[in-house]
A protein has these predicted regions:
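Conserved alpha/beta-hydrolase catalytic His-Asp/Glu region
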Residues: 48, 183-188, 202-261
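Conserved HGGG/HGGXW glycine-rich cap/lid loop of the alpha/beta-hydrolase fold
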Residues: 72-114
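Flexible "cap/lid" loop of the alpha/beta hydrolase fold
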Residues: 162, 170-199
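Acidic catalytic loop of the alpha/beta-hydrolase fold
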Residues: 273-277
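Catalytic active-site module of serine/aspartate enzymes centered on a nucleophile-bearing elbow/loop
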Residues: 292-329
Length: 329
């Protein structure tokens, strides 16, 4: 009887073994494929014009990188830092407004746009990115300037402001990554070894643009031409690598614990309907930075300066104007 029972159970055990073997094989194949994508395969770059439509592109070489930037206008200097995956084209509405009475330097930091890092081992962490901003300002002869930063590079601006307060006149933070709290799910995925590398290589223009739309409430402002202009430099191998490196190496505790040491007059701008970095952080950030001002832009998303350029430009020009008593109505 026991022998008959054993014979009946053998097919079941064989099925379990075959199933487990198949699952292990499929898992091994998936890991191998992901590893090849992450560390071997290199997607093609999309070719396109490198010239900024704002003004003539300029380049300056430093020990860190060959920085791509534009210089527009005349007056007290302002440095503009684009957010992650964007480049200085994002400030196409801001630059003309500020250039009326400022010298505006819009610069692609390492990982942005058409700046090229010289060192393949550049870490893209906060100390490295802060040092890169310092190198750029030194290279173009700026001992001191106001700094405007968006999103991911808001953390860089804050790091620079507390480390070198004598070099920051005024500080504007637009939906910055600044508080040591949970990142959004996509950014958390990029922090996982091999997954982040594979994700950034598998991103296509269509996938990128689909995700980028989440940064806008007024999505008609993200025209096909603008979306393509953002994608072209992002498809560069160095910028794909920077995507996961900057997120994975980002230690927001370095920024969070020094917020009370920011001495520059600071303006915090945030889109009311930001789904990338939640707008509740605006009030918290404002309470942590001494003497800062906070304005939440109604009906705007994460790319607040593109979603509502009229409102943002008004606040920027009022805050940065050479006559500090100027106010907007």
């Amino acid at each position: 009887m026991a022998q008959e029972s054993d014979q009946r159970s053998r097919p079941g055990r064989r099925w379990v073994r075959r199933t487990l073997t198949t699952l292990v094989t499929l898992l091994a194949l998936a890991v191998t494929a992901t590893s090849l994508i992450a560390y071997v395969w290199q997607p093609a770059e999309t070719r396109g014009s490198r010239a900024s439509p704002l003004s003539q592109s300029r380049y300056v070489d430093t020990a860190v990188a060959r920085f791509h930037y534009t210089r527009t206008g005349d007056g007290p200097p302002v440095v503009l830092l684009p957010g992650g995956t964007l480049w200085i084209h994002t400030y196409r509405d801001v630059i003309p407004a500020l250039a009326v009475d400022h010298t505006v330097y819009a610069v692609d930091l390492p990982g942005n746009g058409y700046t090229t890092v010289h060192d393949d081992d550049f870490s893209y962490d906060l100390p490295a990115m802060t040092g890169a901003l310092r190198e750029f300002m030194d290279a173009v002869g700026l001992p001191r300037a106001s700094v405007v930063a968006h999103s991911l590079n808001g953390s860089v601006a804050l790091s620079f402001a507390w480390q070198e307060p004598e070099r920051v006149d005024r500080l504007v933070l637009m939906a910055p990554l600044a508080l040591d709290t949970d990142l959004n799910p996509n950014l958390r995925l990029m922090r996982i070894p091999m997954i982040g590398e594979a994700m950034t290589k598998l991103i296509t223009e269509d996938l990128y643009v689909s995700g980028l739309k989440a940064a806008y409430v007024h999505r008609e402002r993200l025209t096909p031409e603008t979306a393509h202009a953002y994608w072209v430099p992002l498809s560069r191998a160095q910028n794909r690598e920077a995507m996961w490196k900057q997120v994975r190496n980002l230690d927001l505790s370095l920024v969070d614990r020094h917020l009370g040491q920011i001495s520059a007059p600071t303006l915090v701008l945030w889109g009311e309907r930001d789904t990338v970095v939640p707008p509740w952080q605006a009030k918290v950030l404002g309470s942590r930075i001494p003497g800062s001002s906070v304005y939440v832009v109604p009906g705007a998303g994460h790319n607040v300066h593109e979603d509502d350029p009229v409102t943002v430009d008004a606040h920027l020009t009022a805050f940065l104007h050479p006559t500090p008593t100027r106010r907007i109505g």
